[in-house]
Amino acid sequence: MAKLTVKDLDLKGKKVLVRVDFNVPLKNGVITNDNRISAALPTIKYIIEHGGRAILFSHLGRVKEEADKEGKSLAPVAKNLAEKLGQEVIFPGSTRGAELEAAIDALEDGQVLLVENTRFEDIDGKKESKNDPELGKYWASLGEGIFVNDAFGTAHRTHASNVGISANVEKAVAGFLLENEIAYIKEAVEAPERPFVAILGGSKVSDKIGVIENLLEKADKVLIGGGMTYTFYKAQGIEIGNSLCEEDKLDVAKSLLEKSNGKLILPVDSKEANAFADYTEVKVTEGEAVDAGFLGLDIGPKSIAKFDEALTGAKTVVWNGPMGVFENPDFQEGTIGVMDAIVKQPGVKSIIGGGDSAAAAINLGRADKFSWISTGGGASMELLEGKELPGLAALTEK
């Protein structure tokens, strides 16, 4: 990566501004999954072990009006982080003002301070999300010209807490997580060890058009599963019953199939049910066609075998999007089957592009078998599409 990283800096005695991604799920004030906090630890520890004073910024959820602040404070995150670091995390509970500034000025080498949810600044005119120049300048003024971006999850956004701060400091550099994310995903797509197989699931073709187009050029095979299967089926005149279908994307699906030169591989059967939730019948289709009154909710056993065969010998695999409604035990076999087919390949570099696929790997007990699980769904999608990420573009060149 031709950008400066945290290792290129002298941190001793410096107030170091750090954008992390602590956008964790909370239920009644309790963090239900703290993976993102753990993922930021190497960078935070490196800064404090080298005598820096870490000032952390993160958003949490969406905040549009005063009422949205309820349950969106980073206070539980400060507590969790303090436990992980084994030291106090100072939390003034504000995004600006005299109290925050005094707490930052009082920091000693090796201490950590967490600024309150950056999206609290969105209540008055979306200052964070619209990259308000004054806000970026103000936050940059809290440090000493050094900014570390370690939030891959927001690298595709142009916000005050990443791009805004970057524009107002002498050196904006990548943290370890951001560096690893870019290395794994970009290298997999730009310079993969072959055969390179991409697997795309999820419900909508519209979300993945750019990704499919880019990967059809780069990958040796592109396997399609999940709800978007049925838009591809209908585009070929295959009966899909009541399955999910984006009628306005049938032409796009048809054109992708035509220009894929056989690289695009679709399921050959489905697991179908007579309703999405309160179903009374679940069965496997004979072939591709879904029965009238039924909807496809997972790929079937023949498809799992077909995808297993397509993955044989793969050296690089990028997977984004589950094969079915994996949250329901009746429709998780496809996702499990594909995960197992990926991780059993000898010497494979296997990458999960965040979002639902990451949740599936974690919930179904396969996470530790993958080479890399991305922390950013939207950001990894844009990298897979071949786009430049604003948060990355704003960093200082080496």
UniProtKB/Swiss-Prot annotation:
Compartments, as annotated in UniProt: Cytoplasm
Entries under InterPro entries matching the protein: Phosphoglycerate_kinase, Phosphoglycerate_kinase_CS, Phosphoglycerate_kinase_N, Phosphoglycerate_kinase_sf
EC nos: 2.7.2.3
Positions in coiled-coil regions: none
Signal peptide as annotated in the record: none
Gene Ontology process terms (BP): gluconeogenesis; glycolytic process
Top-level division of the source organism's lineage: Bacteria
Pathway(s) the chain acts in: Carbohydrate degradation; glycolysis; pyruvate from D-glyceraldehyde 3-phosphate: step 2/5
SUPFAM superfamilies linked to this entry: Phosphoglycerate kinase
Enzyme class per UniProt: transferase
GO cellular component term, pick one: cytosol
GO molecular function per UniProt: ADP binding; ATP binding; phosphoglycerate kinase activity
Keywords for the protein's UniProt record, in alphabetical order: ATP-binding, Cytoplasm, Glycolysis, Kinase, Nucleotide-binding, Transferase
Reaction catalysed by this enzyme: (2R)-3-phosphoglycerate + ATP = (2R)-3-phospho-glyceroyl phosphate + ADP
Chief site of localization: cytoplasm
Residue positions binding substrate: 21-23, 36, 59-62, 119, 157
Tagged with keyword Cytoplasm: yes
Binding residues annotated for ATP, in chain numbering: 208, 296, 327, 354-357
Family: Belongs to the phosphoglycerate kinase family.
Assembly and oligomerization: Monomer.
Protein name: Phosphoglycerate kinase
Organism from which the protein derives: Streptococcus equi subsp. zooepidemicus (strain MGCS10565)
Gene designation: pgk
